[in-house]
Amino acid sequence: MECVFCRIIAGELPSKKVYEDEGFVAFHDIRPKAPVHVLVVPKEHVEKLSDYPDTEEGERKLGALFRTANRVARVLGLEGYRVQVNGGEKGGQEVFHVHVHVMGGWG
């Protein structure tokens, strides 16, 4: 298994998990850009955001990803937060497994 996030999901690599359910896992970023910086990762491997089909199923999966990001922010007690997705290499994506950055904890 080459994907670092798939290896974290499989328990092969350590992480500081803050949330997990049947479809997603969330853990602290190893190179945080904010006082609180968590990655929300679907357990299903999809390389980049644009790989989700423009169908009802794709919309359902993307909706679940962002609902989970909101849920994670609440679990962390963030009063305000930023959500960021880097789509593809030219969009700044470094790990090619869809993930959402939830960043907060300022001030």
Predicted regions and their residues:
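HIT superfamily nucleotide-processing domains
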Residues: M1-G107
